[in-house]
């Protein structure tokens, strides 16, 4: 009988949801939903120094915003936070101590640092040397008594089989193996404060929750042999492992770093800017996985149906902000107007632009928006001073036929009554200028667009002129004529 599919996303509540962690959650979610399995959220909060108040809520809230749901979590199940499972960890610590597979270590941080310094100076690979090495039982007992009398609190270390080979078939990477002698010696499984270390607790949790597959970033590859040692020591079967490739900056080719200020890296940032969650979901799903074919826009249901762990990439995934913006624009263009207008209203209100023209402005600029917050800079023309022209725009306006076009079009606008000044009547006036002057194409439309809006590209020109208003459009044209004549 096939083993039930149970996967987990296990964040530490140490801050906002990073794009890399969101990808880990999303791939586990897709894997579970595709195979009809169980998706679990577990909170790994044993690192008390880095614990952030509200970090757990932020993680779950942003996962929900992306469109993920889960079957088990701290919200519905007891003891799904590591801090609630200390008794369980202690049970297995005691078992390993009793079986002689682990021992209490009284070496101090200062002694460890001094030994590490000595090893580095000698050109040796830093590793822990068993402090009891060469001691008789009497010497060992005396050493422990002396240390305890000095008030030194011990850690607990797992005894490492130096000659052991720890290998697994990775879902993504293929066969991987480590030699026990290259792990760095016996390692700490319980800290002085009584909390377990990550590599110990995660094994207890995964076994207790019957996790079948562990899908995570390849920065965890070095953790896997240590975890396999714990499985071996406790006589448990390990789950299958899959390690996704790193996410790199598409511009630098280096690992995505918090110093990459040209890239938004936290899901909260995308929420605040008004990206649509389904666009971000779609984009993240393609970071290191490809369903095949040329299509790139997929609904959540389509991604669940198409997901195939065998198509997870062995090469680093390039985070391309421009591609995300293109994808986001596609989603916004195709979204219901009412939804986009509702999302745009808070940005317009904050900017003092929630006027009677707001609905029409959102309709006008919806096809251009990469994120909904762009509605504010896109509508600057209607609420701010005329923008300064770029070099390319000044070059267009230096054309010898530009004054002829602008004078003719200004005259057309001045001749229109308020009743005649509606969107559908503006384009015929531009065509009339073409007929009168013989000027057409870019030489006709571009000077009018730049004179009115200050930009070479934008929404339909008649819509822009109508929303700007007849008087303001005439004023902009007059100002431009004064500049170029």
Swiss-Prot record:
It is an enzyme of class 6 (ligase). Its EC number is 6.1.1.17. It holds the Pfam family tRNA-synt_1c. A motif ('KMSKS' region) lies at residues 255-259. GO terms for biological process: glutamyl-tRNA aminoacylation. PROSITE patterns: AA_TRNA_LIGASE_I. It is found in: Cytoplasm. Coiled coil: none annotated. GO terms for molecular function: ATP binding; glutamate-tRNA ligase activity; tRNA binding; zinc ion binding. ATP binds at residue 258. Monomer. NCBIfam families: gltX_bact. Catalyzes the attachment of glutamate to tRNA(Glu) in a two-step reaction: glutamate is first activated by ATP to form Glu-AMP and then transferred to the acceptor end of tRNA(Glu). PANTHER family: GLUTAMATE--TRNA LIGASE, GLUTAMATE--TRNA LIGASE, MITOCHONDRIAL-RELATED. Belongs to the class-I aminoacyl-tRNA synthetase family. Glutamate--tRNA ligase type 1 subfamily. This is Glutamate--tRNA ligase. It comes from Streptococcus gordonii (strain Challis / ATCC 35105 / BCRC 15272 / CH1 / DL1 / V288).
């Amino acid at each position: 009988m096939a083993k039930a599919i149970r996967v987990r996303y296990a964040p530490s509540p140490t801050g906002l949801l990073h794009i890399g962690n969101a990808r880990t959650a999303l791939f586990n979610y897709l894997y579970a939903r595709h195979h009809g399995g169980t998706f679990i959220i577990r909170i790994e909060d044993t690192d008390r120094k880095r614990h952030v108040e509200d970090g757990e809520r932020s993680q779950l809230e942003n996962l929900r915003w992306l469109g993920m749901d889960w079957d088990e979590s701290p919200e519905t199940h007891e003891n799904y936070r590591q801090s609630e499972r200390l008794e369980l960890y202690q049970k297995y610590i005691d078992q390993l101590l009793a079986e002689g597979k682990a021992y209490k270590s009284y070496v101090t941080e200062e002694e460890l640092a001094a030994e590490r310094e000595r090893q580095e100076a000698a050109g040796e690979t830093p590793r822990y040397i068993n402090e009891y090495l060469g001691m008789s039982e009497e010497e060992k007992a005396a050493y422990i008594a002396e240390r305890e009398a000095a008030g030194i609190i011990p850690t607990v270390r797992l005894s490492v089989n130096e000659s052991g080979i720890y290998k697994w078939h990775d879902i993504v990477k293929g066969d991987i193996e480590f030699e026990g002698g290259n792990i760095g010696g016996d390692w700490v499984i319980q800290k002085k404060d009584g909390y377990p270390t990550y590599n110990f607790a995660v094994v207890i949790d995964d076994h207790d929750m019957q996790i079948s597959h562990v899908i995570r970033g390849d920065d965890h590859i070095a953790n896997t042999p240590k975890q396999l040692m714990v499985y071996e020591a406790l006589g448990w079967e390990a789950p299958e492992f899959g390690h996704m490739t790193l996410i790199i900056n598409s511009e630098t080719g280096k690992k995505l770093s918090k110093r990459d200020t040209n890239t938004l890296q936290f899901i909260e940032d995308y929420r605040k800017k008004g990206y649509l969650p389904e666009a971000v979901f779609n984009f993240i799903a393609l970071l290191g996985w490809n369903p095949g074919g040329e299509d790139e826009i997929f609904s959540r249901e389509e991604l669940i149906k198409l997901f195939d762990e065998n198509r997870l990439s062995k090469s680093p995934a390039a985070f391309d902000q421009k591609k995300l913006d293109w994808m986001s624009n596609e989603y916004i263009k195709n979204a219901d107007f009412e939804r986009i207008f509702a999302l745009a209203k808070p940005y317009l209100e904050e900017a003092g632009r929630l006027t009677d023209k707001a609905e029409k402005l959102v309709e006008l600029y919806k096809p251009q928006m990469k994120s909904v917050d762009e509605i504010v800079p896109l509508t600057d023309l209607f609420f701010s001073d005329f923008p300064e022209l770029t070099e390319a725009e000044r070059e267009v306006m230096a054309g010898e036929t530009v004054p002829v076009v602008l004078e003719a079009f200004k005259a057309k606008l001045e001749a229109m009554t308020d009743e005649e000044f509606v969107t559908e009547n503006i384009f015929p006036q531009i065509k009339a200028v073409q007929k009168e002057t013989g000027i057409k194409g870019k030489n006709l439309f571009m000077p009018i667009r730049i004179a009115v809006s200050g930009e070479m590209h934008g929404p339909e020109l008649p819509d822009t002129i109508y929303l700007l208003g007849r008087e303001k459009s005439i004023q902009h044209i007059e100002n431009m004529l004064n500049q170029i004549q």
